[in-house]
C-alpha cells in the first residue's frame, strides 16, 4: 500500500492523451517520454530506483539497439552499489546513452553524468555538479572495522580511476579534487571534463 506523500505525488503526475486507431490512450508523462527514449533519474540513487532505471535501459535496447537513449539526471547522489548497477548497464548496452544534468548531479549523480557516451554529456546552464569521495558508515564488531575500511578504500580507488578515464584528468588530480565536497558550475564541469558541453537551448 502506498503511503500518503507517495500517493499524492503519483496523483500529481500529468497524463498525456493520444489518439490511436483504436481510440484514445492515456499515458503518464514519464511513460510517454520513455516512448521517445527519455529516462529520468531524479532523487536519491537507491536500489529500487536503480532497478527501474536498469529495466528501462534494457527495454529500450531491446526496442532498438542502434538508437540513442537520453538520461536526464537531477540527483543528490546516494548508494554506490545502486549507482554502479546503473553505470555498468549504461556501459553494457549497445545504444549510446547521452546524459543531461538538470538541477544538480552530486556524488553518484555526477559519476553517472560523466559516464554518458563521449561527446553526449551535457549540463543545462544553471545546474550544479559535485564530486567527492564515497561516504561509509558501519556498525558492528571492532574486528570488522578494518575489513569495511579496506572495502571503502577499494571503492574509492575504483571510482577515482573511472572518473579519471571519463574526464581525461590525471588520477592524482581526481584524488585531490574528490577528497572533499567539490562543487562546480555547469561551465566548470565542462572544463573539468565531467560533461562535454553546456546546453543553452535546443539546437
UniProtKB/Swiss-Prot annotation:
Its main location: cytoplasm. GO terms for molecular function: ATP-dependent peptidase activity; ATPase binding; serine-type endopeptidase activity. It is found in: Cytoplasm. CDD domains: S14_ClpP_2. It is an enzyme of class 3 (hydrolase). PROSITE patterns: CLP_PROTEASE_HIS, CLP_PROTEASE_SER. It catalyses: Hydrolysis of proteins to small peptides in the presence of ATP and magnesium. alpha-casein is the usual test substrate. In the absence of ATP, only oligopeptides shorter than five residues are hydrolyzed (such as succinyl-Leu-Tyr-|-NHMec, and Leu-Tyr-Leu-|-Tyr-Trp, in which cleavage of the -Tyr-|-Leu- and -Tyr-|-Trp bonds also occurs). Its EC number is 3.4.21.92. GO terms for biological process: protein quality control for misfolded or incompletely synthesized proteins. Signal peptide: none annotated. Keywords: Cytoplasm, Hydrolase, Protease, Serine protease. Cleaves peptides in various proteins in a process that requires ATP hydrolysis. Has a chymotrypsin-like activity. Plays a major role in the degradation of misfolded proteins. Fourteen ClpP subunits assemble into 2 heptameric rings which stack back to back to give a disk-like structure with a central cavity, resembling the structure of eukaryotic proteasomes. Belongs to the peptidase S14 family. PANTHER family: ATP-DEPENDENT CLP PROTEASE PROTEOLYTIC SUBUNIT. This is ATP-dependent Clp protease proteolytic subunit. It comes from Shewanella woodyi (strain ATCC 51908 / MS32).
